[in-house]
Amino acid sequence: MESLTLQPIARVDGAINLPGSKSVSNRALLLAALACGKTVLTNLLDSDDVRHMLNALSALGINYTLSADRTRCDITGNGGPLRASGTLELFLGNAGTAMRPLAAALCLGQNEIVLTGEPRMKERPIGHLVDSLRQGGANIDYLEQENYPPLRLRGGFIGGDIEVDGSVSSQFLTALLMTAPLAPEDTIIRVKGELVSKPYIDITLNLMKTFGVEIANHHYQQFVVKGGQQYHSPGRYLVEGDASSASYFLAAGAIKGGTVKVTGIGRKSMQGDIRFADVLEKMGATITWGDDFIACTRGELHAIDMDMNHIPDAAMTIATTALFAKGTTTLRNIYNWRVKETDRLFAMATELRKVGAEVEEGHDYIRITPPAKLQHADIGTYNDHRMAMCFSLVALSDTPVTILDPKCTAKTFPDYFEQLARMSTPA
């Protein structure tokens, strides 16, 4: 297996313009494909997950052109639901941001489509979404294991009164919200259970509004969506920087700044993960906000005990930042780490122990006490981009760290290690 050893880093300083947000990129691509008119998307993320969405749209007859660096996409919308000619199989890798929304959108009309992906995708639950779509009339079969992909979709979704479980993934609700306006009938979506990662629903609603569709949101418990609507292209749309990707650089600034400035997100950003900066501030770093930048300056870091349900992806970065904080850090209400690219609670606990931390792994929490001195270890990444990027921070000590399968960052940030090196002064 390929590996990358990062030597100790004395200081991290400088600015980085962030690649586009994965969450925004894949939502914008799907809405542009469903919309009337041509949309020009700029600062699109070039990554595995976005390529899977683009390949799927192409197979569904959507025409688009990409710039040489794949960050600008001119896409001609279909002016309504996507149609497959004949039976189609779409391979979506491990891209939840493609699998979940497409599973819903392709239930409009009368298609026959199979959605499949990598082995890990077949372990990521989708049963709650399928149950909700079936309530709206969709014909869906599981081809292997009940409640998991691959799925066969045979259209049939018309809207109506639908319940969705909000406790596992906000992507299920996102998928229903984006599909419902194109259903022939009105849809009432009721959320049962605690809604996880609520800020991601705000991204969805924000983008739907940009494409001309507004819905009634009753305290995130019930959404009322008029049927028979159309999405309309906004013309040009700038994808904001990825706030989850910003977390690694901001944390590096907190641990070993200098000052690190990330551009492409700021106080006006719609992504909930910008709140990660508030957590660093609570830990002792100094944060400066602009409309389109966030800067972080080193501080004396101390442990925190916090509910992280609102920023689950960025919370992973706090777990490795905790190695540099005084005291024991507790991250709570993060059960949905277990159904991501890997079981992130298990993976994080396992790898933190390798570098010497004392770790308590609960059903939905993790408690981390840093060692007096970090140990050099080979870090397993579990084919999970965020594991690789989180554990790069270990090099901000006087100990090297070896990252196994470093190229797994291609899911959201192909040149992450080059960018980190560019801003780092070796010890």
Swiss-Prot record:
Reactions it catalyzes: 3-phosphoshikimate + phosphoenolpyruvate = 5-O-(1-carboxyvinyl)-3-phosphoshikimate + phosphate
Entry keyword Cytoplasm: yes
EC top class, as a word: transferase
Binding site for 3-phosphoshikimate: K22, S23, R27, S169, S170, Q171, S197, D313, N336, K340
BP GO terms, sorted: amino acid biosynthetic process; aromatic amino acid family biosynthetic process; chorismate biosynthetic process
Binding positions for phosphoenolpyruvate per the UniProt entry: K22, G96, R124, Q171, R344, R386, K411
One Pfam family of this chain: EPSP_synthase
Recorded superkingdom: Bacteria
Active-site feature positions: D313
Molecular function terms, GO-annotated: 3-phosphoshikimate 1-carboxyvinyltransferase activity
Cystine pairings recorded for this chain: none
InterPro entries referenced in this protein's UniProt entry, alphabetically: Enolpyruvate_Tfrase_dom (IPR001986), Enolpyruvate_Tfrase_sf (IPR036968), EPSP_synthase (IPR006264), EPSP_synthase_CS (IPR023193), RNA3'P_cycl/enolpyr_Trfase_a/b (IPR013792)
Cellular-component GO terms for this entry: cytoplasm
Compartments, record wording: Cytoplasm
EC number in record: 2.5.1.19
Protein's pathway: Metabolic intermediate biosynthesis; chorismate biosynthesis; chorismate from D-erythrose 4-phosphate and phosphoenolpyruvate: step 6/7
PROSITE patterns associated with the record: EPSP_SYNTHASE_1, EPSP_SYNTHASE_2
Annotated keywords: Amino-acid biosynthesis, Aromatic amino acid biosynthesis, Cytoplasm, Transferase
Recorded family membership: Belongs to the EPSP synthase family.
Subunit details: Monomer.
Function description: Catalyzes the transfer of the enolpyruvyl moiety of phosphoenolpyruvate (PEP) to the 5-hydroxyl of shikimate-3-phosphate (S3P) to produce enolpyruvyl shikimate-3-phosphate and inorganic phosphate.
Record-given protein name: 3-phosphoshikimate 1-carboxyvinyltransferase
Organism the protein comes from: Salmonella typhi
